[in-house]
Protein backbone atom coordinates (compact mmCIF):
# COMPACT_ATOMS: atom_id res chain seq x y z
CA UNK A 1 0.00 0.00 0.00
CA UNK A 2 1.38 3.40 -0.99
CA UNK A 3 1.85 6.20 1.50
CA UNK A 4 -0.93 8.78 1.54
CA UNK A 5 -0.25 12.01 -0.36
CA UNK A 6 0.20 14.32 2.63
CA UNK A 7 1.23 17.74 1.32
CA UNK A 8 1.36 19.64 4.61
CA UNK A 9 0.92 19.19 8.36
CA UNK A 10 0.21 22.15 10.62
CA UNK A 11 0.06 22.41 14.40
CA UNK A 12 -2.37 25.17 15.35
CA UNK A 13 -4.44 25.41 18.51
CA UNK A 14 -7.16 27.13 16.46
CA UNK A 15 -7.16 24.30 13.91
CA UNK A 16 -8.77 25.64 10.70
CA UNK A 17 -9.34 29.40 10.49
CA UNK A 18 -8.87 32.25 8.02
CA UNK A 19 -5.06 32.15 7.89
CA UNK A 20 -5.11 28.43 7.21
CA UNK A 21 -7.68 28.99 4.48
CA UNK A 22 -6.00 31.92 2.80
CA UNK A 23 -2.31 31.24 3.25
CA UNK A 24 -1.58 27.56 3.76
CA UNK A 25 -4.21 26.20 1.40
CA UNK A 26 -2.85 28.55 -1.27
CA UNK A 27 0.70 27.33 -0.73
CA UNK A 28 0.09 23.57 -0.42
CA UNK A 29 -2.86 23.28 -2.83
CA UNK A 30 -4.61 20.42 -0.99
CA UNK A 31 -7.97 19.05 -2.03
CA UNK A 32 -8.70 17.67 1.45
CA UNK A 33 -8.09 19.00 4.95
CA UNK A 34 -8.04 16.37 7.69
CA UNK A 35 -8.55 17.76 11.18
CA UNK A 36 -7.09 15.16 13.55
CA UNK A 37 -8.41 16.25 16.93
CA UNK A 38 -10.52 14.33 19.43
CA UNK A 39 -12.45 17.38 20.61
CA UNK A 40 -13.25 18.74 17.14
CA UNK A 41 -14.25 15.28 15.92
CA UNK A 42 -17.17 15.31 18.35
CA UNK A 43 -18.14 19.00 18.24
CA UNK A 44 -20.53 19.94 15.42
CA UNK A 45 -20.26 23.66 16.20
CA UNK A 46 -16.47 23.67 15.76
CA UNK A 47 -16.89 21.58 12.62
CA UNK A 48 -19.42 23.99 11.15
CA UNK A 49 -17.11 26.98 11.61
CA UNK A 50 -14.12 25.18 10.11
CA UNK A 51 -16.22 23.87 7.24
CA UNK A 52 -17.12 27.44 6.27
CA UNK A 53 -13.43 28.26 5.89
CA UNK A 54 -12.71 25.13 3.87
CA UNK A 55 -15.77 25.65 1.67
CA UNK A 56 -14.70 29.22 0.91
CA UNK A 57 -11.42 27.84 -0.46
CA UNK A 58 -13.03 24.99 -2.40
CA UNK A 59 -11.38 22.31 -0.28
CA UNK A 60 -13.01 19.27 1.32
CA UNK A 61 -12.68 18.84 5.06
CA UNK A 62 -13.03 15.81 7.34
CA UNK A 63 -12.89 15.56 11.13
CA UNK A 64 -11.43 12.49 12.83
CA UNK A 65 -10.06 11.60 16.23
CA UNK A 66 -6.31 11.16 16.29
CA UNK A 67 -6.76 7.37 16.51
CA UNK A 68 -9.23 7.28 13.62
CA UNK A 69 -6.77 9.29 11.51
CA UNK A 70 -4.07 6.71 12.29
CA UNK A 71 -6.46 3.88 11.42
CA UNK A 72 -7.64 5.22 8.05
CA UNK A 73 -4.98 7.50 6.58
CA UNK A 74 -3.36 4.69 4.58
CA UNK A 75 -6.70 4.07 2.82
CA UNK A 76 -6.57 7.51 1.19
CA UNK A 77 -6.76 7.71 -2.57
CA UNK A 78 -3.51 8.75 -4.28
CA UNK A 79 -5.54 11.57 -5.87
CA UNK A 80 -6.13 13.13 -2.46
CA UNK A 81 -3.69 15.93 -1.60
CA UNK A 82 -4.05 15.91 2.17
CA UNK A 83 -3.39 18.77 4.57
CA UNK A 84 -3.46 17.47 8.16
CA UNK A 85 -4.16 19.94 10.96
CA UNK A 86 -3.66 19.05 14.63
CA UNK A 87 -4.10 21.18 17.74
CA UNK A 88 -0.94 20.21 19.68
CA UNK A 89 2.59 18.92 19.15
CA UNK A 90 1.61 15.86 21.20
CA UNK A 91 -1.05 14.98 18.61
CA UNK A 92 1.50 15.31 15.80
CA UNK A 93 3.90 13.10 17.71
CA UNK A 94 1.20 10.46 18.22
CA UNK A 95 0.53 10.42 14.47
CA UNK A 96 4.24 10.00 13.71
CA UNK A 97 4.76 7.30 16.35
CA UNK A 98 1.85 5.35 14.88
CA UNK A 99 3.02 5.32 11.29
CA UNK A 100 1.46 8.38 9.70
CA UNK A 101 4.14 9.47 7.19
CA UNK A 102 4.57 13.13 8.07
Residue ranges and their predicted role:
Residues 2-8, 12-15, 20-32, 36, ...:
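N-terminal intrinsically disordered, cationic/polar leader segments
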Residues 27-30, 52-55, 80-83, 102:
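Short, low-complexity, polar/charged sequence segments that are solvent-exposed and flexible
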Residues 60-102:
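Ordered, amphipathic secondary-structure segments that act as subunit-interaction surfaces
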